[in-house]
C-alpha cells in the first residue's frame, strides 16, 4: 500500500498501482527477485515490452487502462480514436488549458504530474529516496566537480507512475544544454521496489542536462528510466531559449522519475511539501502547479 499526501483536501490518499500484484511478487519472492536480476532489469525486457506498446496490437489495452484508473480523457489534446497503439495514448499531450502556467517569475512550478519529494540542505553523500534509502549524488551524476556545486542545495524527486501524464516541462525561461546519457538497468522506481533495491536511481538508465534558468540559477534536470520504459525522449532543442512550461520531453510506457537539483539559497519549497517529505510521504502535484518560490 502506497500512501501519499493530497494538497487539495489536506489528507492522505492511497495510490492505485498499475501492476501491483506483479510488483509485489517480483520484489518480494525469491523467484521474482531472481527473474528480476536475470532478465527484468535488463534493457532487452523493456525493449520487448516497448516494441509491443508501439504496435497496433496493444491498442486493446487502452480502454481497460482508462476504466481501471479513471483517466480523464477530456483533458487529452487528441481523441481516443486517434491513438493507434498504447504508447500513443500513454504519451498523449494535454490541452493547454488543462495545465495553466503561472507567469510570475518568482514562482517555482512542478515540471510534471506525479508524486513529489523535496529535500533541502543536500548532503552529496546521502540523498534520500522514498522509504528512507540513501544514495550518493556523486554516483548519480558521475561528475564530482559538478556535484560539488550543489552541496547544501535543494533536491526535488518527482515520481511519475504509469497512470500519470508522462510529459515533462521546463520550470522557467532559460537555455538547456545537451543531454548527457548514463547507461544502467531498468528497475522499477515504485516505492515497493525502492525499499528492496538500494540506490535504484544510481543503477538505472538516466539522462541529465544543465538548465540555465533565468530566475533559479543553473539546475540539473535529470530523467530516470524504469522497468518497461522503452525510451526517454528529449523533444527540446539544446542551447536554444525555452519558455516556462515548454515541453522538455516524455517517457514511453512505464513509471519514471524526474529529479531536479538546485544550488544553495536559490529556492524555497512550500512548507506542506517539505513537512510531508520529512515524514516520508510524497505529495501529489500536477505540471504547472506552484510548489515553491525564488529566494
Curated annotation (Swiss-Prot):
Membrane-topology descriptor: Peripheral membrane protein
The pathway to which it is assigned is: Phospholipid metabolism; phosphatidylethanolamine biosynthesis; phosphatidylethanolamine from CDP-diacylglycerol: step 2/2
Its domain of life? Answer: Bacteria
Q: Which UniProt keywords apply?
A: Cell membrane, Decarboxylase, Lipid biosynthesis, Lipid metabolism, Lyase, Membrane, Phospholipid biosynthesis, Phospholipid metabolism, Pyruvate, Zymogen
Q: Name one Pfam family in it.
A: PS_Dcarbxylase
Q: Where is this site: Cleavage (non-hydrolytic)?
A: 255-256
Note whether Cytoplasm occurs among the keywords.
no
PTM annotation, UniProt: Is synthesized initially as an inactive proenzyme. Formation of the active enzyme involves a self-maturation process in which the active site pyruvoyl group is generated from an internal serine residue via an autocatalytic post-translational modification. Two non-identical subunits are generated from the proenzyme in this reaction, and the pyruvate is formed at the N-terminus of the alpha chain, which is derived from the carboxyl end of the proenzyme.
- Protein localization: Cell membrane
What's the family? Answer: Belongs to the phosphatidylserine decarboxylase family. PSD-B subfamily. Prokaryotic type II sub-subfamily.
Described function: Catalyzes the formation of phosphatidylethanolamine (PtdEtn) from phosphatidylserine (PtdSer).
Q: What's the protein here called? A: Phosphatidylserine decarboxylase proenzyme
Q: Write down the species.
A: Clostridium botulinum (strain Langeland / NCTC 10281 / Type F)
Q: Which gene encodes it?
A: psd
Amino acid at each position: 500500500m502506497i500512501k501519499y499526501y493530497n494538497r487539495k483536501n489536506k489528507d492522505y490518499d492511497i495510490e492505485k498501482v498499475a501492476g501491483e500484484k506483479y510488483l509485489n511478487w517480483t520484489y518480494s519472492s525469491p523467484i521474482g527477485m531472481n527473474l528480476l536480476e536475470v532478465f527484468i532489469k535488463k534493457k532487452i525486457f523493456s525493449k520487448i515490452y516497448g516494441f509491443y506498446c508501439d504496435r497496433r496490437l496493444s491498442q486493446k489495452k487502452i480502454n481497460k487502462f482508462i476504466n481501471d484508473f479513471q483517466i480523464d480523457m477530456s483533458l487529452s489534446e487528441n481523441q481516443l480514436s486517434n491513438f493507434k497503439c498504447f504508447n500513443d495514448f500513454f504519451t498523449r499531450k494535454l490541452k493547454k488549458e488543462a495545465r495553466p502556467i503561472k507567469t510570475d517569475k518568482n514562482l517555482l512550478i512542478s515540471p510534471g504530474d506525479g508524486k513529489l519529494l523535496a529535500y533541502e540542505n543536500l548532503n552529496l553523500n546521502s540523498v534520500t529516496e522514498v522509504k528512507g534509502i540513501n544514495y550518493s549524488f556523486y554516483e548519480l551524476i558521475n561528475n564530482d566537480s559538478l556535484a560539488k556545486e550543489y552541496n547544501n542545495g535543494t533536491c526535488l524527486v518527482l515520481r511519475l507512475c504509469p497512470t500519470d501524464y508522462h510529459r515533462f516541462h521546463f520550470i522557467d525561461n532559460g537555455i538547456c544544454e545537451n543531454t548527457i546519457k548514463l547507461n544502467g538497468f531498468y528497475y522499477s522506481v515504485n516505492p515497493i521496489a525502492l525499499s528492496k533495491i538500494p540506490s535504484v536511481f544510481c543503477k538505472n538508465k538516466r539522462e541529465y542536462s544543465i538548465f540555465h534558468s533565468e530566475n533559479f540559477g543553473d539546475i540539473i534536470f535529470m530523467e530516470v528510466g524504469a522497468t518497461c520504459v522503452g525510451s526517454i525522449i528529449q523533444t527540446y532543442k539544446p542551447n536554444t531559449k525555452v519558455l516556462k512550461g515548454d515541453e522538455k520531453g516524455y517517457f514511453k510506457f512505464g513509471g519514471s522519475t524526474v529529479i531536479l537539483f538546485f544550488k544553495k539559497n536559490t529556492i524555497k519549497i512550500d512548507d506542506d511539501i517539505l513537512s510531508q517529505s520529512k515524514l516520508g510521504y510524497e505529495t501529489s502535484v500536477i505540471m504547472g502547479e506552484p510548489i515553491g518560490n525564488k529566494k
